Regions:
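Single conserved hydrophobic/aromatic residue that forms the stacking wall/gate
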Residues: 1-12
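Generic hydrophobic secondary-structure packing signal
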Residues: 4, 42-45, 109, 113
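N-terminal first-folded block
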Residues: 24-67
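Basic/aromatic recognition patch in beta-strand/loop cores that engages polyanionic ligands
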Residues: 58-107
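Well-ordered alpha/beta subsegment
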Residues: 104-135
Length: 135
């Protein structure tokens, strides 16, 4: 007989995800800078949510993540009355690229924030397409 239940076995088979912070073509670490800009406790909560995303990937659902548009999803972070969002997409099945973060001030997500994420997604893909084809 097996010592490990099938449910426990499924945990071991779970897809392993890698988190990557988007950096601009000039090397500017825009995602790292956003996270550094958050107050310490809000930053800690953001890293906790990023850890959940890394562990569970596409199986993570609301209230943690929400589909925004096309390939773009948002990681939803709330600390006290502060709300922030991190837009991301999945690349090559198991790499989650964090594209753009912002502190949310209004009920509706500003279109400009989504557009920034979309531009960064296209930039990331254009710079990484060749390396993917060579693997």
């Amino acid at each position: 007989t097996h010592c490990i239940s099938s449910a426990a076995s499924d945990v071991y088979k779970r897809q392993i995800y890698k988190i990557e912070f988007y950096a601009a073509a000039d090397g500017k670490e825009v995602m790292a800078e956003f996270l550094d800009s958050l107050p310490p406790k809000h930053q800690a909560k953001a890293f906790r949510e990023i850890d959940l995303l890394e562990r569970f990937g596409s199986s993570l659902k609301e209230p943690y993540v929400k589909h925004i548009d096309g390939e773009i999803w948002e990681l939803r972070i709330r600390f006290s009355s502060d709300i922030s969002r991190i837009f991301y997409f999945t690349w090559n099945f198991n790499t989650i690229v964090l594209l753009h973060g912002f502190v949310k001030k209004t009920q509706k997500t500003p279109r400009g924030e989504i557009e920034t994420a979309q531009k960064r997604l296209l930039d990331y893909k254009s710079r990484h397409a060749l390396t993917t084809q060579n693997q």
